[in-house]
């Protein structure tokens, strides 16, 4: 309106059109401009309305523009009111649903694991006091009270669980320091010195960009993890030492956060006991109780003396009445001569006659064979060739020594 010094219906319509256009755009930066224009229009209009000329068309146009602005303004107001109401209802309903869910099934009791709910607050305290996980008497009583209250909120499924006591919590921390590996790190990397262990834990947490527990005394020592490890080990730090410390640390944190199933079923011990010995038929299966889970040390049975039986030895001069298996004896030229000489006449008399049997009917094959099949499936090595070879005519006419002839008959 300030751009139009002479107030008229035409300038009034143009001002309303600008307000309508900027109002429908609904930009954040246009809101102060709209407020300023509306205030100026409201201030100047009552003073100049009486001096305006009568123009029904322009007046009708002013009424239409004003009506559109009014309808749009009411719509925006309803939208804002509805949004505020819906937002409030959504926040209220969500809060009620979360409270109901927390009351019926808390996060710590959603899984039926023995270490989850009862040990939740104890594990949390262990992590917060990792540099010195030795709770005071006041802290123990507070943890016991907090744990029992959490257990009572679980519901009927845990109603038969007895309340936790202070001495049980003390035993849990003793076992937790050992099972998690905290005591192992204390012994291996801190010389079993709790002050060194405290400084080592703080250096590790500081190197991992984690918050360290508050300290009552100011530490003037170095917070560099490698320097602390090297000082505790008493020698230069090696990559193997650093890797072992990192592995032990990761294993400790994993146990504290997630833990393991601390209760092993009795069936495991029964299975181990049954696999050690074979039960007799008709005997009942032994059931391993708590008292029998650690059997007494077994003593090694005395070794039975070995029976010393003399192994039969082959004699170079066996007799005819020997009962030993002759197939196990090594045949030598002397043995062959003796054995064949003893049995040659009996074999010759019971089977064939010397005049009707030619042992060399196959030519020289028998002389080329390394062994000769004798009676009783006993193999006898053939005699080695002598230095003096037999003449061909002697072999063909059967003129060979008597000993060789005996070998063929046996």
Swiss-Prot record:
Sequence segments annotated as region (Highly conserved between B alleles) = 111-410
Q: Name one Pfam family in it.
A: Ustilago_mating
Chain residues forming the annotated DNA-binding region = 107-184
Gene3D superfamilies for the chain: Homeodomain-like
Q: Metal-binding: present as a keyword of the record?
A: no
Chain positions covered by the region annotation Disordered: 201-239, 278-335, 374-395
User: Which GO cellular component does the record give, naming just one?
Assistant: nucleus
Residue spans crossing the bilayer:
none
Biased composition, class Polar residues, residue ranges:
312-335
* Region of interest (Variable domain between B alleles), ranges: 1-110
Residue ranges for motif Nuclear localization signal?
276-308
Tell me the superkingdom of the source: Eukaryota
Q: Where is this region: Not essential for B2 function?
A: 333-410
Start-end of Low complexity biased regions: 205-233
Q: Which GO molecular function annotations are given, in alphabetical order?
A: DNA binding
Give GO terms for biological process.
Answer: regulation of DNA-templated transcription
Q: Which family does it belong to?
A: Belongs to the TALE/M-ATYP homeobox family.
Primary role: The B locus has at least 25 alleles, and any combination of two different B alleles yields a multimeric regulatory protein, that activates genes responsible for the pathogenicity and for the sexual development of the fungus within the corn plant.
Q: What is this protein called?
A: Mating-type locus allele B2 protein
Higher taxonomy: Eukaryota, Fungi, Dikarya, Basidiomycota, Ustilaginomycotina
